[in-house]
Swiss-Prot record:
Transmembrane regions listed in the UniProt entry: 6-26, 55-75, 85-105, 134-154, 167-187, 208-228
Source organism per UniProt: Halalkalibacterium halodurans (strain ATCC BAA-125 / DSM 18197 / FERM 7344 / JCM 9153 / C-125)
Taxon lineage: Bacteria, Bacillati, Bacillota, Bacilli, Bacillales
Protein name in UniProt: Cytochrome c-type biogenesis protein CcdA
Gene Ontology process terms (BP): cytochrome complex assembly; sporulation resulting in formation of a cellular spore
Cellular component, GO annotation: plasma membrane
Length: 238
């Protein structure tokens, strides 16, 4: 029975990738992997950096789901009790990142990596990706609520808190695999992507617009509303 439950949690994570407010964010995810490494209208991120950022993004949203698995603990209650605040903070940060990509604002802290070093500090890139994954997950939870809710019920029936957290970890790994595969394919296609260098300013601004829109929706709480609506009309039933 335990093995069946674990496999259900894993499959639910994979299926959640197809939900209507996770899958459409893949382009933004790709922009996050390389977006800040555009110098002189050329992509300068290497394969190792892209994969590291992908792992950071995965670690960020995995942390959220593990906290949910520990909902009976202080950390879980703190997150649930202040989820709206987390969404608003996340909305502000994502909006700032988007404005930076659009060229509307120029924040020295975000530009210092490119200006001071030939290659960005990998630790800083990893930390930024963890933060973005953490913030996006706060907005995802309403959309994947049906699937996640079922997993939380199973986790609540677990014998121990650690069993519940383990189940949410397996769910996160199911969701993480498609994201990592996308990053792997993206990193292996860099030589082709670089042929689009002349279009990078437009692509970068377009990605920035999407991030600003997501940030505003998160801050106003409309992301959750739209996500809940899309979840109802989703043909996959997830």
């Amino acid at each position: 029975m335990v093995e069946v439950t674990i496999w259900l949690a894993f499959f639910a994570g994979v299926v959640s990738f197809l939900s209507p407010c996770v899958f459409p964010l893949v382009p933004v995810y790709l922009a996050q992997l390389t977006g800040t490494q555009i110098s002189g209208n050329e992509i300068t991120a290497d394969r190792k950096l892209i994969l590291m950022r992908s792992l950071g993004f995965i670690l960020g949203f995995t942390s959220i789901f593990i906290f949910l698995g520990a909902s009976s603990t202080f950390i879980g209650q703190l997150f649930w009790g202040n989820r709206q605040l987390f969404e608003q903070i996340g909305g502000i940060i994502i909006t700032v990142f988007g404005l930076q990509m659009m060229g509307v604002i120029s924040i020295r802290m975000l530009l210092s990596e490119k200006r001071l070093q030939a290659k960005p500090r990998q630790s800083a890139s990893f930390a930024n990706s963890v933060l973005i994954g953490f913030l996006f997950a706060t907005g995802w939870t309403p959309c994947i609520g049906l699937v996640l809710g079922a997993i939380l019920v199973l986790a609540g029936d677990a014998n121990t808190m650690w069993s519940g957290m383990s189940m949410l970890f397996v769910y996160s790994m199911g969701l993480a695999i498609p994201f990592f595969l996308v990053a792997l394919l993206w990193s292996r296609s860099l030589h082709k992507v670089r042929k689009l260098n002349k279009w990078l300013p437009t692509i970068q601004k377009g990605s920035g617009v999407v991030m600003v829109a997501l940030g505003v929706l998160l801050f106003t709480g409309q992301f959750s509303t739209i996500a809940a609506y899309l979840a109802r009309i989703n043909p996959f039933g997830i």
